[in-house]
């Protein structure tokens, strides 16, 4: 699949779910994309395209759908996978930060030993909305003395302005809507 077509491919394989998880929110359901092996493979290939094997030490996946996409990205890059989870979901000591969501507030955590100082970290998630979750991920990476090298998303909801809260040069989205 040519890279120029990846946005169209993603758009053709997601569905909008109105009023989920709360009234006024249009949820971007990526499960149709995940169910098609060739489409899922093309998405993973597109997400790793800007990075060389060995240039990323850890790939962060943000709970929950970010896990699904980040793990194969980590595998392709020869990097470790690090889950960032909602508060109280990790079994070991954690670093945490709270942030605003499109529809409320949340806290995410990462294990205190998830990164080594200086680790080069790529953050992968399914959707960039307000940028709160991604900014929180960057904060946790910084707290751990690691270095974020990129933020990659399947879908960017441009109207919500999330890109403006993040280092613009680090943000890559396969589809901007």
Swiss-Prot record:
Pathway(s) where this gene product acts: Purine metabolism; AMP biosynthesis via salvage pathway; AMP from adenine: step 1/1
Superkingdom assignment: Bacteria
Gene3D superfamilies linked: 3.40.50.2020
Signal peptide range: none
Enzyme Commission no: 2.4.2.7
GO molecular function, one term: adenine phosphoribosyltransferase activity
Main EC class the enzyme belongs to: transferase
Catalytic reaction equation(s): AMP + diphosphate = 5-phospho-alpha-D-ribose 1-diphosphate + adenine
GO cellular component: cytoplasm
HAMAP family linked: Aden_phosphoribosyltr
Protein known as: Adenine phosphoribosyltransferase
Organism of derivation: Acidothermus cellulolyticus (strain ATCC 43068 / DSM 8971 / 11B)
Lineage: Bacteria, Bacillati, Actinomycetota, Actinomycetes, Acidothermales
Gene designation: apt
